[in-house]
Amino acid sequence: MAETIETRPFPPFLPKNTTVMMMGTFPPTSEKRSMEFHYPNFQNDMWRVYGLVFFDDKEHFRKGEEKAFDADKIKAFLSEAGIASCPTVLKAIREKGNASDAFLKVVEPVPLAEVLDRIPHCKHIGTTGGKATEILLSLLPEKVKLPKTGETIPFVFNGRELTLTRLPSTSRAYPLSLAKKAEAYKNFFKTCGLQTK
């Protein structure tokens, strides 16, 4: 049986005023999505983390009482804050048919140069987990040591000076409390010069 190659279902979200870009790996399968936008799985805590960091309310981006997030509200916030969202993977094979990074075979990574050209003011990249960090580092012209979770490293890409911070995964499978994840993201965004709660 031939393995199915999937292309990322959503385009990168790249506000013109972007100073920070968040990069995960690859969205979950369609039946796991609560909206048609990045980090769509209601079981993933990304938008709860954003709610806590910027509004002191983990339900801020929830769509009413639904088990779903509000994509329009999220996009409006990201646009205002200057935060981009772009997976590190363009095409992949799900070896076990699920969203696990452990069984994600990268067929084609993101065209990083093309993405960064569209956000000339971006200075900081936050990767949301180990696999995303590994993929991003594989795209750099020079070999860079994999940072530990919470660590920030400087790097140069196409003559641009940027920083890369490896953040904890917001997947429920990652063994860290929501409060601790929010604290790590808050520290990152504050370091990047964004206003947090």
What are these regions (language model features)?
Residues K58-E59, K123-H124, V144:
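Secondary-structure boundary/capping signal
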Residues M22-T25:
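N-terminal nucleotide-binding beta1-loop-alpha1 segment
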Residues M1-N17, P28, R33, P40-F42, ...:
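C-terminal capping/extension of enzyme domains
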Residues E80-L139:
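Internal catalytic-core helix/loop-beta-alpha segment
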Residues E31, M35-L104:
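Short, surface-exposed acidic-centric catalytic microdomains
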Residues F13, K75-L78, D117-R118:
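Short, conserved, surface-exposed binding loops centered on an aromatic residue
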Residues K16-T18, S79-A81, P120-H121, R160:
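Residue-level preference for short coil/turn positions at secondary-structure junctions
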